[in-house]
Amino acid sequence: MKKRSSGILMHITSLPGDFGIGTFGKSAYEFVDFLEETDQTYWQILPLTTTSYGDSPYQSFSAVAGNLNLIDFELLSESGLLEKGDYEGVNFGDNKEKVDYELLFNARRPILEKAVENTKQNSSILEEIEKFEQENTSWLPDYAEYMAIKESFGYQSLNHWDEDIKRGEQQARERYRAELKDSIRYYTVTQYFFFKQWLELKKYANEKGIKIIGDMPIYVSGDSVEMWTMPELFKIDESNEPLYVAGCPADDFSPTGQLWGNPIYDWKKHKEQNYSWWVYRVQESFKIYDVLRIDHFKGFSDFWQIDRDAEDAVNGTWEEGPGIELFEKIKEQLGDLPIIAENLGFIDAKAEKLLDDSGYPGMKILQFAFPDHDSLDLPHNYTANSVAYTGTHDNDVVNGWYEKLSEDEQKLVAEYLNQRDDETITQAMIRGIHSSVSDYSIVTMQDLLDKDASSRMNVPSTVGGNWEWRMLAEDLTEEKKEFLKDLTNRYAREREENDEI
């Protein structure tokens, strides 16, 4: 039987600090120390890939390249690439609890440019950069070139580029490489900064017994290096434009469905190539994570396909995905891997069978359990091979969710959880998942801190105001630490060496 364990869900961007956004610096190391101190096993984060307009980590210019916002300036200073005066006194935003992405976009760039320029004076770092480039030829040159060209077009999306370079014609690419050498080097070296800092942080966490649960979106963005260099992997027209886009059909929560806009995969082409790109993508993910959550798992059994010109997601069609064949190929190439399947939303018998056949643990969200007396998300219906959550980045925090319930529904929740007089409703919910039979129990940081609805990370199908929440260092009191450690040990979820998911 697998070892019971627990962890915290909080993205890097939500860490406290002085740079307007959470980074790989001191606060990240202190967060690892907190996880160790409270006997946790997992730190779950959102995708680390570079973000685009809307700031969502699920819409990236690359399926591999890292988010430059997470690079820590103090660590660059310790490496001799920056002076403290290069970043101290810079305005990164006045609100310590919210990220101002537009401000950061303009404030961080000149500082990173200075660090990139200073690498030219450090021979040992230049050797490390050269080694990094040699080890990442499968994605790094294309990414750096793509971003440099995008910048030269005023950051316009791929479909607004000149036709020759949009189609990746060799002569055009050679011309842009010659013209944009400095910009290409910037995007190359900053990836070196990103991966050096992240892998050092991950090593520190692993040495403390903390494993990183990463996140892989099912789809890539239509404005991405993959769409540019591998258009044949998607359903496209003769101009390399997507014929269809992804989303979810209408339901009780979204009467017009969810129109995500990502290009749809040509699964027939992937199969012809033995799913080599997927094997590669998963392999790259496990270079930076210990465990991998795969988003929208249902999309591998059936996916909702919407015409590219549609204004909403109502009139799509269900199309067949690759099914278990894809995951058998991944297992054949990479062995058994610790993967979590995000099986939320509309799940039919076919999707359930795919989850069962894969053997991956699915997710249970306690907020989804009420007020349905028969819900499979009620803890007494959990199975051991599952991951229990109070909520995720797409849910309201417990306090915000609870406030929206009717008085009768609130009473039902309190009675089911047998809420004690000395407990908040959030603490009762955390106890509910920790005491369940699920092998793994994950609490959002907002819920551990008993935050209100203003700390919600994301409202799906909305633009603006998302992905901004940050904790304050003083939020994490000794009382909160003691509560988490006590609950973790009471329900036999304390960390042990060689824990496996």
PLM feature segments, named:
Residues M1-K26, T38:
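Mature N-terminal, pre-catalytic/accessory segment of carbohydrate-active enzymes
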Residues H11, G17, D55-Q191, F195, ...:
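Alpha-amylase-like alpha-glycosidases and glucanotransferases acting on alpha-linked glucans and related
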Residues K26-T51, I288-Y289:
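Catalytic domains of carbohydrate-active enzymes, especially glycoside hydrolases
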Residues E36, W198-N206, K331, L355-D356:
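Surface-exposed amphipathic alpha-helices with a cationic face
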Residues L46, K211-I213, P217, V291, ...:
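Outer-envelope exported proteins of Gram-negative bacteria
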Residues Y187, Q191-V220:
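Conserved, well-ordered alpha-helix/loop/beta-strand core segments that scaffold catalytic motifs
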Residues K451-I501:
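In a subset of proteins, long, contiguous C-terminal domains/tails are tracked
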